[in-house]
Amino acid sequence: MGIQLTNTMTRRKEPFHTLEPGKVKMYVCGPTVYNYIHIGNARPAIVFDTLRRYLKYRGYEVTFVQNITDVDDKLIRVANQEGVTVKEVADRYTDAYNADLKSLNVSPPDIQPRVMQTIPEIIEFVQGLIEKGFAYESEGDVYFRTGRFQEYGKLSHQPLDDLQAGARVEINEKKEHPLDFVLWKAAKTGEVTWDSPWGEGRPGWHIECSAMALKFLGEEIDIHAGGTDLVFPHHENEIAQSECFTGKVFARYWLHNGMLNIDNEKMSKSLGNFLLARDLSEKFGGQLIRFFMLQGHYRNPINFSEELIEQAANGLDRITTAYTNLSHRLDTARAEEPNDQAQEQARIIGELRERFIAEMDDDINTANAITVIFDVVKEANLYLRHQNVGETEVRAYMDLLVELTEVLGLDIAEEQELLDSEIDALIEERTEARKARNFARSDEIRDLLAAKGIVLEDTPQGVRWRRK
């Protein structure tokens, strides 16, 4: 059936068809770099990086663009408070953002444009809208004529009359209509500005993404994505600007991830539950944070708590332990000619891969895909119970675990110190091997643990262990 994605525009799950066969043009709204990102900001980075990875896994050539908003009211305020330039603030937090994403194993975008580097294109875009009658200048500001775009509200599914009624609460004498939004802001004291046909000023927020998407991906793109908080007004305004400027459909698929709560409450500084992504990565490890995020469907809200993180850690531990156990058995697995057992394992492995693909094809359902990975672990563990295992089959399970977890951006093959739970699992396996009089396997586990610096002591009360 192929990949299907839930399109916010239609509110339906739709078959995924690209503008150009085999190629995907994808734009994801990036951060405003005035501070370190919080854990909620990390969610779209992780889920849409996973989408990108899966599209590549399925054979697509993906061009992934994520912008950096490096000029904004908040940036200007921080720069003025610190007595530095806006660029200095932006550079500092852009570097921090990229470092945070690296710790979460989020691949860098193919293109990471910045607003300050796109000013000429933004001015050209605004001028084009004015010339087409979709925008107007008012005392140095430039506004978009929302009423000229009859489809305004089609992404957020809000009737234009309702939007207009709500906008009347805010009175701005510069606007022709309360719902009109700013494309270019006239200069104010203490702000960074650029020269334009309308005088000194700087861009409005919404026009920036439209201009950067046009510059680096063209008039039409396949996927535009971001958090649900961006549906209105940001993405709604992007559509209005872009489609009025080009006369073409801006994006085929609009994807939005659900929000993240902390202990079932909205994250806010006033509640004292404002958690930075870097702090959590340092405390729990970026791989665990990523795994936790992917345990829920990307479109649904997700709740963060230390209890849930601990549960996620247990799940991730099951996967890494299975891979470790497989790698340990590889040394003693025997090379053999194909037989009925080998054919059965090949069939099981093939079916598991197909199930994983089916779940990911279904609107990138990482939650169900992880369930399939747990089934891989289960089948691998069942196979390892055999006294004699084949090298081909052990390696096939290892390769499958790496293949599927890499799609999710997890690195289970990285050499790591044995976790306590992994040591306990190996000791339990050794005990079972001794009960079954499989002394070769028992000695193999002891030697393996010794190589990892783990000393075993057999006592009347059971096996004790310690690190050298």
Curated annotation (Swiss-Prot):
Q: List the InterPro entries.
A: Cys-tRNA-ligase, Cys-tRNA-synt_Ia_DALR, Cys-tRNA/MSH_ligase, CysS_C, Rossmann-like_a/b/a_fold, tRNA-synt_1_cat_dom, tRNAsynth_Ia_anticodon-bd
Main EC class the enzyme belongs to: ligase
Keyword ATP-binding assigned to the entry: answer is yes
Catalysed reaction(s)? Answer: tRNA(Cys) + L-cysteine + ATP = L-cysteinyl-tRNA(Cys) + AMP + diphosphate
UniProt cofactor(s):
Zn(2+)
Subunit architecture: Monomer.
**PANTHER family, alphabetically?**
CYSTEINE--TRNA LIGASE, CYTOPLASMIC (PTHR10890:SF3), CYSTEINYL-TRNA SYNTHETASE (PTHR10890)
Concerning NCBIfam families, the annotation shows: cysS
Record's protein name: Cysteine--tRNA ligase
Please name the taxonomic classification of the source. Bacteria, Bacillati, Bacillota, Bacilli, Bacillales
Q: Which gene encodes it?
A: cysS
